[in-house]
């Protein structure tokens, strides 16, 4: 079931990769009419088709959550949230900007994996050279390879022990439903590590400003208000956004 969910999400993600090719060939597109009616089914296949449509609609509603769980989005958005809080401006950049930047960085970082899925799974499936099951297997394996590279062994060992599974000898012995939460734990650990490194210089500025204000007897003046311009100045002088983007990108290699 998890493999089918991941494959269907990958199909929708890869649409923008193949849409230029489709429109350049001027192939007439036939739009299907999908309806769900409450009535008596004359054949078992009609009930199965209706259930498949309902399952597809459910998958579409869960697509954002699945995208977050199996890609680099979690680490990126958490780190950018730490940047906002470390600067002392929780509302700037706005949440919409943070989410948008996280999505585009996710597509950039995941581009090799998506290209591999398109070449090995989606394109052969659309050409009719492989079956749906084989395409799902290849697509999920590409995502599993990415998640294995970013997952720490202790997180995998923790989830394997919770699942009461025997000690795996190969990667194929680890189920996808065990790999995904282990991957998320590793992503959160990496994001919090980067967040700690981001906080250190801004914390030093806060301590220096607070000490100066106390020595001048200005204890009623909020240190955060005074330190914010200095934090912004430091962030601009060191080209903070370039450093953050570079660090996030290199952390996945």
Range-by-range predicted roles:
Residues 2, 23-253:
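Hydrophobic alpha-helical segments and their helix-loop boundaries in membrane
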Residues 1-25:
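N-terminal secretory/membrane targeting signals
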């Amino acid at each position: 079931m998890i493999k089918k969910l991941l494959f269907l999400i990958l199909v929708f993600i890869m649409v923008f990769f193949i849409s230029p090719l489709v429109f350049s060939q001027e192939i007439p597109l036939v739009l299907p009419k999908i309806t769900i009616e409450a009535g008596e089914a004359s054949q078992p296949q009609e009930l199965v088709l209706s259930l498949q449509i309902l399952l597809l609609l459910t998958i579409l509603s869960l697509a954002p959550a699945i995208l977050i769980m199996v890609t680099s989005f979690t680490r990126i958005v958490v780190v950018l949230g730490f940047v906002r809080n470390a600067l002392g401006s929780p509302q700037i950049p706005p949440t919409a900007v943070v989410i948008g930047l996280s999505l585009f960085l996710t597509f950039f970082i995941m581009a090799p994996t998506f290209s591999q899925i398109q070449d090995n799974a989606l394109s052969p499936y659309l050409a009719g050279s492989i079956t749906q099951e084989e395409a799902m297997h290849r697509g999920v394996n590409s995502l599993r390879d990415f998640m294995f590279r970013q997952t720490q062994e202790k997180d995998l060992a923790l989830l394997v022990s919770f699942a009461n599974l025997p000690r795996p000898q190969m990667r194929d012995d680890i189920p996808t439903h065990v790999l995904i939460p282990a991957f998320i734990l590793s992503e959160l650990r990496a994001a919090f590590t980067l967040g700690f490194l981001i906080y250190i210089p801004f914390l030093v500025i806060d301590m220096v400003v607070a000490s100066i204000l106390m020595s001048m007897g200005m204890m009623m003046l909020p240190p955060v208000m005074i330190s914010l311009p200095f934090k912004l100045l430091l962030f601009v002088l060191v080209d903070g956004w370039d450093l953050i983007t570079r660090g996030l990108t290199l952390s996945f290699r």
